[in-house]
């Protein structure tokens, strides 16, 4: 439900904002920030990070209970790392959280992201590499922009470059997969203030929301993904 809310919000407001930008030459920075603020509102949370802190390895930024070498195709263990760092980010940036603006937590976030980039876990299920991981990274980077202390530009840029390199191309996919990949293209475009990438991403987010006889919305309002299925 959260993803659908974000999707249609981005389609409607994003396209309107972007067209206005092109037509009236309004500040691009304001337009990108407006989209990022909508994303933050959709994912806002006040997490309990007690368990994550207990498992955090201060020596290298990893988590002691995560198998980073795992390549299993479902419930991919390394994704726990990104989910916990994401919780750290939301705790650090939420005024209602006890760890709000906590310097030690900031250091854990930075070291945890450095570890992830250097370790570069890989899954045999493409979905984790091209959708789950880059989406989660995009959201946490957007949220971290609101922090008292910002991530080093070098760290943020190399994470964005990794997302670009490994995150896939939405135009090569159909249906929900196309939309899911396009979403993290939107996140990356906003963070890098790349108008061309944003336009491409918005086109691909909107594209599956049409009737088709292939994967996607059918004329009877059903939806096909991964092939056709018989009604039960």
Predicted regions located by residue number:
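Alpha-helical protein-protein interaction elements
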Residues: 9-10, 35, 55, 108
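Residue-level detector of solvent-exposed, low-hydrophobicity positions
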Residues: 11-15, 39, 134
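Short, flexible coil/linker elements and helix-boundary hinge sites characteristic
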Residues: 14, 19, 46-47, 147
